[in-house]
Amino acid sequence: MSRISMEQVKHVAHLARLAITEEEAKLFTEQLGDIIQFAEQLNELDTEGVEPTSHVLDMKNVLREDKPEKGLPVEDVLKNAPDHEDGQIRVPSVLE
């Protein structure tokens, strides 16, 4: 794969709605090019006989069983709330 161009960096920045300067675009072009070049080195590895994996370790589901449990009583929760009304925690408005 060829190195990434400055136009590609600017295009990705535009898609991500990032305002970048010319200096930043040049820096990111160099940095991304180095990253791509480093990743391309993986193509040179001999993977003959290596089975594809999705995890480095042979792990199964390590999560605990999901069991429903009783929560705190509403009264105890409201004791910790700075403001409440009608059994609901009141928070500052986030919409105008």
UniProtKB/Swiss-Prot annotation:
Keyword Translocase applies: no
One Gene Ontology MF term: glutaminyl-tRNA synthase (glutamine-hydrolyzing) activity
Record's catalysed reaction(s): L-glutamyl-tRNA(Gln) + L-glutamine + ATP + H2O = L-glutaminyl-tRNA(Gln) + L-glutamate + ADP + phosphate + H(+); L-aspartyl-tRNA(Asn) + L-glutamine + ATP + H2O = L-asparaginyl-tRNA(Asn) + L-glutamate + ADP + phosphate + 2 H(+)
Superkingdom of the organism of origin: Bacteria
GO BP field: glutaminyl-tRNAGln biosynthesis via transamidation; regulation of translational fidelity; translation
EC number: 6.3.5.-
SUPFAM superfamilies the UniProt entry points to: Glu-tRNAGln amidotransferase C subunit (SSF141000)
Alphabetical list of InterPro entries matching this protein: Asp/Glu-ADT_sf_sub_c, GatC
Assembly information from the UniProt record: Heterotrimer of A, B and C subunits.
Protein's UniProt name: Glutamyl-tRNA(Gln) amidotransferase subunit C
Organism: Halalkalibacterium halodurans (strain ATCC BAA-125 / DSM 18197 / FERM 7344 / JCM 9153 / C-125)
